[in-house]
A protein has these predicted regions:
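Short regulatory "switch" loops immediately downstream of catalytic or recognition motifs
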Residues: 1, 50, 147-160, 211-215
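GST-like fold's C-terminal all-alpha helical module
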Residues: 143-166, 170-178
């Protein structure tokens, strides 16, 4: 397999890179054989793209995220800091439509689209389902964790933007999970995570990149340059995993149903 066809440039700018773990084996909280291949192709990309001396890597405490990070860390000769708030977003509740426990990102379209609050960045956690799931407490924990990390790197949250108290060109890499990724993106971009959970799919090993913009001195915001990028898989002729998606047509029993 050829995995050098895409040339990645090592850039010096303030970046926040969010990496979803490789194809998961949830039974053992690790990766499938395919997931390990994805992690290897990802590590080749990361080695080419990152400057070790300006890169800081953080991981979820869950095995599938740490295993995905392992090969990148090995190639770079680095270690990662583990944060509990980077674990998968835990806010399940009984779904009225099915009578079973559902995670926040698996609600049926007819359910979540009928409640205007789900589209609101400040009200999405106040719907009956999200209240039962205690999504307000869980999301506040993630918001606080992310803001504390960014403050450590020189950016302090103020209203909907960040004060650039020490503007810099660090690269922050977070190895984590789709659910918590959307919560962080919602916080940074001012979007309800419910819209992101149900309207996007960051496939396993995908890379999402955000940059800071400081158009006025001391006032910074984040802009997403790419979401769910899989160029490292395309370069290696490795197909994307179907994980995080449901059946494209109801009659296709080979694809995920609920």
């Amino acid at each position: 397999m050829k995995i050098e066809t895409i040339k990645y440039r090592k850039e010096r700018k303030m970046r926040l890179i969010i990496v979803r773990h490789g194809d998961p084996n949830y039974e053992i909280d690790s990766l499938t054989e395919k997931g390990w291949r994805e992690a290897e192709f990802l590590s080749v990309r990361m080695e080419k793209q990152l400057q070790k001396e300006h890169t800081y890597i953080y991981t979820s405490p869950l095995g599938r995220a740490k295993d995905t990070a392992y090969l990148t860390l090995k190639k770079l000769g680095m270690t990662a800091t583990e944060f509990k708030w980077l674990r998968e977003f835990e806010a399940p509740a009984i779904d009225e439509d099915t009578g079973t426990y559902k995670v926040c990102w698996d609600l049926l379209p007819a359910r979540w689209t009928s409640e205007p609050a789900y589209y609101d960045k400040d009200q999405w956690m106040n719907t009956p389902f999200m209240k039962k799931a205690k999504a307000d407490t869980e999301s506040a924990w993630v918001y606080d964790g992310l803001d504390s990390l960014l403050k450590k790197h020189g950016y302090t949250r103020e209203n909907g933007y960040y004060r650039a108290e020490h503007a810099n060109r660090d690269t922050i890499v977070l190895f984590c999970h789709f659910g918590v990724e959307c919560v962080m993106l919602g916080h940074l971009l001012g979007i309800s995570p419910v819209v992101l959970w149900h309207g996007t799919a960051a496939a396993p090993s995908s890379v999402t990149t955000l940059y800071t913009e400081e158009r006025r001195e001391g006032i910074a915001s984040f802009r997403m340059q790419s979401f769910g990028d899989l160029s490292h898989l395309y370069a290696a002729d490795e197909p994307a995993s179907f994980a995080a998606r449901f059946c494209e047509t109801y009659d296709n029993m080979a694809e995920r149903h609920d």
